[in-house]
Amino acid sequence: MMNLRVLFLALLLLASPLLQVARCQSDAEDHSSLVDDVVGENTDDAVEEDDHDLDMNLSSFPGVETVCVFPKNSAKLVPAGEETELLVGLKNEGKTRVGVMGIRASVHLPYDHKLLVQNLTMLRLNNASIPTSLQATFPYIFAVSQYLQPGAFDLVGYIIYDVEGKPYQSVFYNGTIEVVESGGLLSGESVFLLTLGIGLLLLLGLWAYSQVQRLTKKTKKVSKVEVGTRSTEASLDEWLEGTTLAKTSSGKTKNKKN
């Protein structure tokens, strides 16, 4: 009965992290949906008018080359909820001036870019001019949602520019980034797995201890029965001494000797 109580308490301890994770996820989803509703109501109209020219499906212009670098972050690790910087380079190999209008990016699921995860910050550059045969570098700082689950995602970035009054865009990055949890070396999943492993080891230790205790008790019981039998036989011999049966037995023994 005691072992059952211990096992029940251990199971409760193991289940408590699951309940906390589920509760945190539900709270995060509710908070995220609330933020999206509020932000959408207050900013949709203004952003739609201001960034309409930067959010169109545009083609690239021949002679414009782009490059992207994650400074001091070759692994492309992006902490959720924290700012991440990348450098966007644009080289003008054409025959006319290029005016850079802005930079935009978005996060997608790696297996299907039609499934949008998050639109990132729109950076307006106000037609920064790049003469022919020259290049320029622009820092772009973005932050993915703090509620985004750690894992691999695809980042797609565009730089929008103007050539002779007509807008164009070129892709400067289309690849995988690794979203990680911020504020610690261990993620929530790692802590949970570590707790689960320790709990299983404790349960295994309790089970082994109970088996050893059971075998020890059985050994003690068997040894007591043997001692009791010997003492009973000795007491019977003492009780038979001096009785008729004992005398008869001794007489038969003497006759056999004669």
Curated annotation (Swiss-Prot):
Recorded topology in the membrane: Single-pass type I membrane protein
This protein's GO CC annotations: chloroplast thylakoid membrane; endoplasmic reticulum; endoplasmic reticulum membrane; Golgi apparatus; mitochondrion; plant-type vacuole; plasma membrane; vacuole
Known glycosylation sites: N57, N119, N127
Main location as per UniProt: endoplasmic reticulum
PTMs per UniProt: Phosphorylated in its cytoplasmic tail.
Lumenal side: 25-190
Keyword tags: Calcium, Endoplasmic reticulum, Glycoprotein, Membrane, Phosphoprotein, Signal, Transmembrane, Transmembrane helix
Subcellular localization: Endoplasmic reticulum membrane
Cytoplasmic face of the membrane: 210-258
A Pfam match: TRAP_alpha
Segments traversing the membrane: 191-209
Extent of the signal sequence: 1-24
Family, per entry: Belongs to the TRAP-alpha family.
Note: Seems to bind calcium.
Function as written in the Swiss-Prot or TrEMBL entry: TRAP proteins are part of a complex whose function is to bind calcium to the ER membrane and thereby regulate the retention of ER resident proteins. May be involved in the recycling of the translocation apparatus after completion of the translocation process or may function as a membrane-bound chaperone facilitating folding of translocated proteins.
Notes concerning its domains: Shows a remarkable charge distribution with the N-terminus being highly negatively charged, and the cytoplasmic C-terminus positively charged.
Quaternary context: Heterotetramer of TRAP-alpha, TRAP-beta, TRAP-delta and TRAP-gamma.
Protein name: Translocon-associated protein subunit alpha
Record organism: Arabidopsis thaliana (Mouse-ear cress)
